[in-house]
Amino acid sequence: MLHVIRRSRATSARQLPRVAGLLAGAAAVRSRTYIGTRILHEEQKPKKPEPPNSILTEDMLARAGVDAERGPETEKAPAEDKAGESTETGSGAGKKKRARKTTTEIKRERYANLFYLFSLTGLAGGAVYMSRDWDADEPEEERKGIENGYTPGLMYRRFKARFDSLFTFFQEPPYPDLLPPPPPPPYQRPLTLVLPLEDFFVHSEWTQQHGWRTAKRPGADYFLGYLSQYYEIVLFSSNYMVYSEKVVEKLDPIRAFITYNLFKDHCVYKDGIHIKDLSHLNRDLGKTLIIDTDPNSVKLQMENAILAEPWDGKADDALLRYIPFLEYLVTQPINDVRPILNSFKDRHHIPEEFAERVEKLRAKFNADQKAKAGSGLSFLLNPGMASKPAKFPLDLIREEGEKNYVRFMKLIEEEKEKLKLQQEHMSAPTFTLKDMAEGNMPTPEEQMKMQLQKQKEFEELYEKEKQKMQQQTKGQ
């Protein structure tokens, strides 16, 4: 028994290396099988396609306004992003990512910050400079009532006065005196009459068939020709010179009636309105009156104004109704027209109210004449005058004015060509803007002497041209 056990142990010991070898081989086979299966599984697994590389860089996308860091998942689920954003905001765990800035944007922001800094510094320096004490050469009317000193109140008032004066260049007329000084008394008209152009002498309208057309009011030529013997007529247009100059030339081509032309450029701009300020005309306001269709245009000197209804382009005789009053006004020895104009109730209907007054005076005058004619004493003193009633004084003035108008128009018709040449020869000004700026303007007497000298030179030149024309006519 013991022998059998020993023999089996010996046999087992001899077979032990073989068994160990078989076990090692089986383990190797199993390992190779597992590794091969894993490799096969990995090879059979589909590969994800790689995203294509774009030729657009992040800088280019940022310049175009595209957020390069935003993925497709963010675009697919905007609701989830909003929910997540609110959660993060409430918890304070996260912050929004700043968009990436390009180098150009960074430089642009830097230059903008520098610009803001220099601008604020310049504005502050300008404000301090404008609130300084008054200089000796600053106008007296600008610093009127404001003293020097560096208290906050005085500095603010000086700053405001200087700041407001910057805009007077655009609000005031181009010159303080729009007209030259009036001629000496022998050559001066007693009164100055300022007249509008638009909707008083002319009316412009646009139609689809004809476009823009301008109509001249009936009686315009007679109105200007008749009153030019009494008044210095100034035509003050409410449009700019570039639009109205040609119309004025058509209205008075030889400049026989209108003395001066003014336009919208010469108005005062105040409270959003262009105002015709008579104080800039270099004329006595007591001897100046203006007719206009817009009350806002004469609001600074309403006591000098006669308001007219705008003309709508239809034929009327409204211009002729102004002549009796204007003729009466200029033929009376008055020093100020404003009290007479203020005596009328309505400035829109002065011609009608004046006509009523004249009729009352005429009736009273005729009654007095009849009473005088019926008395025997007047018949004995002057029998010839008793049979001929006296004329109303205003009728005598009108008859004399008509005679002068006829003579004047006849002279213009005869001398039309001469007047055109004279206008071209004497259109040169007697002084320049440099003379006005330097204060070297000639006196009215000196200007009249210059005009007379030009007139003399023109007469000599015209006589020579006339003789040449006569010789050429005889030669033919």
Curated annotation (Swiss-Prot):
Superkingdom, taxonomy of origin: Eukaryota
Region (Disordered): 40-103, 435-455
Membrane topology term: Single-pass membrane protein
Transmembrane segments: 111-130
SUPFAM superfamilies named in the record: HAD-like
Comp. bias regions, Basic and acidic residues: 40-50, 66-85
Name under which the protein is recorded: Mitochondrial import inner membrane translocase subunit TIM50
Organism: Eremothecium gossypii (strain ATCC 10895 / CBS 109.51 / FGSC 9923 / NRRL Y-1056)
GO molecular function (one): mitochondrion targeting sequence binding
Role played: Essential component of the TIM23 complex, a complex that mediates the translocation of transit peptide-containing proteins across the mitochondrial inner membrane. Required to direct preproteins in transit and direct them to the channel protein TIM23, and possibly facilitates transfer of the translocating proteins from the TOM complex to the TIM23 complex.
